């Protein structure tokens, strides 16, 4: 998978080259290129923003700069991803769908966002998805890109040591993942649930399912189908 990120703060994306993501790069499973948007500016000050039409606070990122940048780094077969609090929710299902893509391009906005015409123009030749990682506002799109890339890349074959690691994740079956335990059996007066020590795989699986349902019912009842939410 090829990943391109366009931003005015390339250093913000350095975590993409660390830990498991860095190992995925070393293995050739992904390639990551981070591009400084200011390369495509047209003035000596390398300005990327201007005052909004219609008035209002803040600044809007220029279409002239972004248009040239996307022309250069976003080919017709790529998926262009725009992190924005005004986007559709990014979910595990989104991550799974994107994991099948060959090329993702992320456009990191700042200030009051990017001129809408940038995406309207891009949509003439590429698929564009405006996506939100939550109902809150960040300073820019870079942190959201780190979240989304990690969620997607960990699903690629060979990135995680154990394929079941993501197959049993929260949201993989529509539920939150239940509690996890490791050694020692007893710690500060708290015990590992005996069922996990039984060696009975069927009973362990049933217990984990029950815990997953209980946690989802308590913390995210909106994820449950109507017939399960009141069980």
From Swiss-Prot:
S-adenosyl-L-methionine binds at residues 109, 133-138. It comes from the Bacteria. Its main location: cytoplasm. SUPFAM superfamilies: alpha/beta knot (SSF75217). Keywords: Cytoplasm, Methyltransferase, S-adenosyl-L-methionine, Transferase, tRNA processing. The keyword tRNA processing applies. It catalyses: guanosine(37) in tRNA + S-adenosyl-L-methionine = N(1)-methylguanosine(37) in tRNA + S-adenosyl-L-homocysteine + H(+). GO terms for molecular function: tRNA (guanine(37)-N1)-methyltransferase activity. Its EC number is 2.1.1.228. Pfam families: tRNA_m1G_MT (PF01746). It is found in: Cytoplasm. NCBIfam families: PRK00026.1, trmD. Homodimer. Belongs to the RNA methyltransferase TrmD family. Specifically methylates guanosine-37 in various tRNAs. This is tRNA (guanine-N(1)-)-methyltransferase. It comes from Nocardia farcinica (strain IFM 10152). The lineage of its organism: Bacteria, Bacillati, Actinomycetota, Actinomycetes, Mycobacteriales.
């Amino acid at each position: 998978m090829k990943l391109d990120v366009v931003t005015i703060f390339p250093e913000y994306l350095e975590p993409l080259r660390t830990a498991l993501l860095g190992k995925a790069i070393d293995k050739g499973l992904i390639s990551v290129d981070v591009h400084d948007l200011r390369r495509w500016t047209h003035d000596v000050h390398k300005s990327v923003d201007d005052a909004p039409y219609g008035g209002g606070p803040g600044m809007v990122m220029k279409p002239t700069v972004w248009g040239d940048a996307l022309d250069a780094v976003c080919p017709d077969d790529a998926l262009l991803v725009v992190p924005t609090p005004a986007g559709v929710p990014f979910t595990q299902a989104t991550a799974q769908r994107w994991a099948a893509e060959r090329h993702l391009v992320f456009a990191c906005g700042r200030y009051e966002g990017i001129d809408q015409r940038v995406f309207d123009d891009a949509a003439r030749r590429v698929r564009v998805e405006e996506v939100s990682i939550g109902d809150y506002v960040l300073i820019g799109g870079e942190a959201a890109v780190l979240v989304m890339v990690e969620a997607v890349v960990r699903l690629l074959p060979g990135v995680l040591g154990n394929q079941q690691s993501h197959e049993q994740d929260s949201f993989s079956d529509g539920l939150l993942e239940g509690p996890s335990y490791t050694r020692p059996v007893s710690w500060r007066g708290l015990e590992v649930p005996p069922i996990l020590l039984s060696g009975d795989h069927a009973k362990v699986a049933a217990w984990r399912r029950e815990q997953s349902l209980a946690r989802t019912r308590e913390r995210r009842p909106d994820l449950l189908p109507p017939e399960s939410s009141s069980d």
